[in-house]
Amino acid sequence: MTSDGATSTSAAAAAAAAAAARRKPSWRERENNRRRERRRRAVAAKIYTGLRAQGDYNLPKHCDNNEVLKALCVEAGWVVEEDGTTYRKGCKPLPGEIAGTSSRVTPYSSQNQSPLSSAFQSPIPSYQVSPSSSSFPSPSRGEPNNNMSSTFFPFLRNGGIPSSLPSLRISNSCPVTPPVSSPTSKNPKPLPNWESIAKQSMAIAKQSMASFNYPFYAVSAPASPTHRHQFHTPATIPECDESDSSTVDSGHWISFQKFAQQQPFSASMVPTSPTFNLVKPAPQQMSPNTAAFQEIGQSSEFKFENSQVKPWEGERIHDVGMEDLELTLGNGKARG
């Protein structure tokens, strides 16, 4: 008796302990569960009413969600058996496949990826970023490829590309920052700026100017008509004028003439112009021709290198001495 009473007492104590271990929901939690269930049933009743009225579904009065799912599958062309086995019409699975778990993938299951799915890998993935970071190797130049249709340019297959060139990797991604292992990341090529470009252009211009054997002088007076066959006058450019008037209206033009290189420079070859004062004067020496030219008196013709030189229209060849000039203040009379 004692043993039986002890056993019953211990069983009652264990049941009481198990009941005490389970947490009893509060009144508020029970009320929330009831309200949630009522809302779910009200929504389901409205769905069933709409399907019966407008969808011609044969649903019982008190049905659950399984009945609705079965009716939808039948409308879509699927077969739903009493045990829940679902399949397309004419494609009943084998008994071995039906005996599997519910998560078993069947040939006609909705979990099977279709060939047109976006998750299906394409031959050339568009999401690869670079050969080093991509798990799919890009086509290279050195890899053999026997499929002519997969080559974009079939004429480059045999002998079109020399084998001495390094392997070319093709990437369909946007330009990205090179990895640390890339040689371009350690020694990046400096970007050119305007200052370096200007210095390089000036150096090239100086080298090209130094290659000429003839110096350039700036003259503001046009060349003589008799000397046009000796010196070529290039196209003129406007002279720099700091006045308010326009250079086009002022008519001031500057031209560059090329004079023959002579050692030493003669005074007759250097143009007598105010603009020439801006150029560093060359060492001048008197030549026999210059001395003979200064000794010639006033005449309409003179000899130059044993030949008669005639003036052009409107020109008078004469020498004016400094002692023959006098500054007059409006009286117009020269010294007697």
Swiss-Prot record:
UniProt note: phenotype after gene disruption: In bzr1-1D, weak dwarf phenotype with reduced hypocotyl and petiole lengths and dark green curled leaves when light-grown. Increased cell elongation in the dark. Hypersensitive to brassinosteroid (BR).
Record flagged with keyword Transcription regulation: yes
Gene Ontology annotations for the cellular component aspect, listed alphabetically: cytosol; nucleus
InterPro entries membership: BES1_N, BZR
Single biological process term from Gene Ontology: negative regulation of DNA-templated transcription
PANTHER family: BES1/BZR1 HOMOLOG PROTEIN 3-RELATED, PROTEIN BRASSINAZOLE-RESISTANT 1
Protein name: Protein BRASSINAZOLE-RESISTANT 1
Species: Arabidopsis thaliana (Mouse-ear cress)
Encoding gene, per UniProt annotation: BZR1
